């Protein structure tokens, strides 16, 4: 499964709408970088965040998710110490049938104890990506909206898969905004 280069990512974004909006060159001046890189795409975090809180003493249960588990905030945010937030990408992704996408955090945030987690983007999945952001430090941590948050790496299979995410009618297909757990 080879990793795909900038030329392929650019072509797929232009011709197939794989990433919209697509930033052709990496933006770096005065911001946490985002846009096309050599072998990946650095996505931006949008302005909507759901920060987990214990105000209502809710239990986080993936089978019965309670909306009072978090508070919604917009713009640049601060994640409390040892806490967690959900966010989503500015970009909308359309993954080709022969491609699997893996996400890694940005070193700028990782070096501050901020960890980003995203499950793989499966073949023929599409939508805005919900991002999990953990503040592993004992201090409040700042997250900047509309700046880079993670890097997506595109791996192309030797042949298209037999059953894609779209074929399975996956529950997170075409998600928009922050999407909480579904069964």
Curated annotation (Swiss-Prot):
Per UniProt, the enzyme's principal EC class comes to hydrolase
Give the superkingdom in one word. Bacteria
Per the UniProt entry, the Enzyme Commission number(s) are: 3.5.4.13
Query: What are the entry keywords?
Result: Hydrolase, Nucleotide metabolism, Nucleotide-binding
Recorded catalytic reaction(s): these are: dCTP + H2O + H(+) = dUTP + NH4(+)
A Gene Ontology molecular-function term? dCTP deaminase activity
Binding-site residues for dCTP, renumbered to this chain: 106-111, 151, 165, 175
**Where are the active-site residues found?**
132
InterPro entries named among the record's database cross-references: dCTP_deaminase, dUTPase-like_sf, dUTPase_trimeric
> Which sequence ranges form a coiled-coil region, renumbered to this chain?
none
Q: Which GO terms describe its biological process?
A: dUMP biosynthetic process; dUTP biosynthetic process
Q: Does the keyword DNA-binding apply?
A: no
**Pathway the protein contributes to:** Pyrimidine metabolism; dUMP biosynthesis; dUMP from dCTP (dUTP route): step 1/2
What function does the entry list?
A: Catalyzes the deamination of dCTP to dUTP.
Q: Spell out the PANTHER family in the cross-references.
A: DCTP DEAMINASE (PTHR42680:SF3)
Q: Which family does it belong to?
A: Belongs to the dCTP deaminase family.
NCBIfam families documented for this protein: dCTP_deam (TIGR02274)
Assembly and partners? Homotrimer.
Q: What is this protein called?
A: dCTP deaminase
Q: Which organism is it from?
A: Gluconobacter oxydans (strain 621H) (Gluconobacter suboxydans)
Cite the source lineage. Bacteria, Pseudomonadati, Pseudomonadota, Alphaproteobacteria, Acetobacterales
């Amino acid at each position: 499964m080879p990793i795909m280069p900038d030329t392929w990512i650019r072509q797929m974004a232009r011709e197939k709408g794989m990433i919209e909006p697509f930033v052709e060159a990496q933006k770096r001046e005065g911001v946490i970088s985002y846009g096309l890189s050599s072998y990946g795409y650095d996505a931006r975090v949008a302005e909507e965040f759901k920060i987990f809180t214990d105000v209502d003493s809710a239990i986080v249960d993936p089978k019965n998710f309670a909306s009072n588990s978090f508070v919604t905030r917009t713009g640049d945010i601060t994640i409390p110490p040892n806490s967690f937030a959900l966010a989503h990408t500015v970009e909308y992704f359309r993954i080709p049938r022969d491609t699997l996408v893996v996400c890694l955090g940005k070193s700028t945030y990782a070096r501050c104890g901020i960890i980003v987690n995203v499950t793989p983007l499966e073949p023929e999945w599409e939508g805005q990506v919900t991002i999990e952001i953990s503040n592993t430090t004992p201090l409040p941590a700042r997250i900047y909206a509309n700046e880079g948050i993670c890097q997506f790496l595109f791996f192309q299979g030797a042949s298209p898969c037999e059953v894609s995410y779209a074929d399975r009618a996956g529950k997170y297909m075409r998600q928009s905004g922050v999407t909480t757990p579904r069964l």
